[in-house]
């Protein structure tokens, strides 16, 4: 009975894959060797709304001037071409660390797009890109716990690593069976509010926007992730790293960039994420990071070398997200047993310093870093 259930699960969720090896993945870093990054235009921010298994997200990470940290996110997912589901997520970390964070996750109904697929709509929800491609408005009244009314305006060009921002999966790279793409607005101005039952929270400050598409089953795409969003008074540093599953040789892909208002200083696929100290989580055995070192290296447009790093203690985690917590118990047991997955996301937002060297110029700037370490398999 269990083997039958396992097979049925594999058919839909894809819990087992053979070992294809590293030749079956084409990292975006290969493109980035010739073209470190390309600027992302309005055309590069269209929803794909794939009709095969995929997860597509638009995520807005806000670092408010008043100390709040917030996330607003739309998730569009397709399971095996059978069912499409959409979700609006909102999370707010209180500036008082002793207070619980707010989390609202609401299924969306009647999802649709505008004609060129740059804006997303559902009942009581709209995430719209402006005609000139310089700002998003995010409005949601799906949860009375978190009524969202935000405007996110980019203050520097958007970018993607390489020419496409995409890593391909498959034994034939011309006809891949999967992909992961990321595009970023690394430094934005945020304004507006998230209104809770206690009243409105002013989210004037800085923001990062991330567009992501996993054009395959997420737990086939990557086993681990590191995500960094550093926002300082003058500079922003961002990073997205994933490690493919052993099926694809546990290949490491890391994209990131350093920017300031109006200028991409450096972007590409030569950044690194290291957990310099870890402690075993007593509940699930994952090596939870306690100290980190993140580095960026490359060159400016005029060929000045760029080196940057952020390192230090993460402090107490602000959350540990059990990714499968909302999955029904029976299904969760099967998935965990069949796939060997117990996915958790560890979240932190310490104040740390960005050390930046551009040519002979050395800069040190303190800022707020929101960072995640995700363990899937």
Swiss-Prot record:
SUPFAM superfamilies in alphabetical order: AttH-like (SSF159245)
Topology in the lipid bilayer: Peripheral membrane protein
Main subcellular localisation: Golgi
UniProt keyword Transcription, yes or no: no
GO cellular component: cis-Golgi network membrane; cytoplasm; endoplasmic reticulum membrane; nucleus
Pfam families: Svf1, Svf1_C
Residues forming coiled coils: none
UniProt function note: Ceramide-binding protein that may transfer ceramides from the endoplasmic reticulum membrane to the cis-Golgi network membrane, and is thereby required for the biosynthesis of complex sphingolipids.
Region annotation Peripherally associates with membranes: where it falls in the sequence: 1-18
Protein name: Ceramide-binding protein SVF1
Family membership: Belongs to the SVF1 family.
Record-level GO BP terms: ER to Golgi ceramide transport; response to oxidative stress
GO MF term (any one): ceramide binding
Key words, A-Z: Cytoplasm, Endoplasmic reticulum, Golgi apparatus, Lipid transport, Membrane, Nucleus, Transport
Cell compartments where the protein resides: Golgi apparatus, cis-Golgi network membrane; Endoplasmic reticulum membrane; Cytoplasm; Nucleus
Keyword Membrane (UniProt): yes
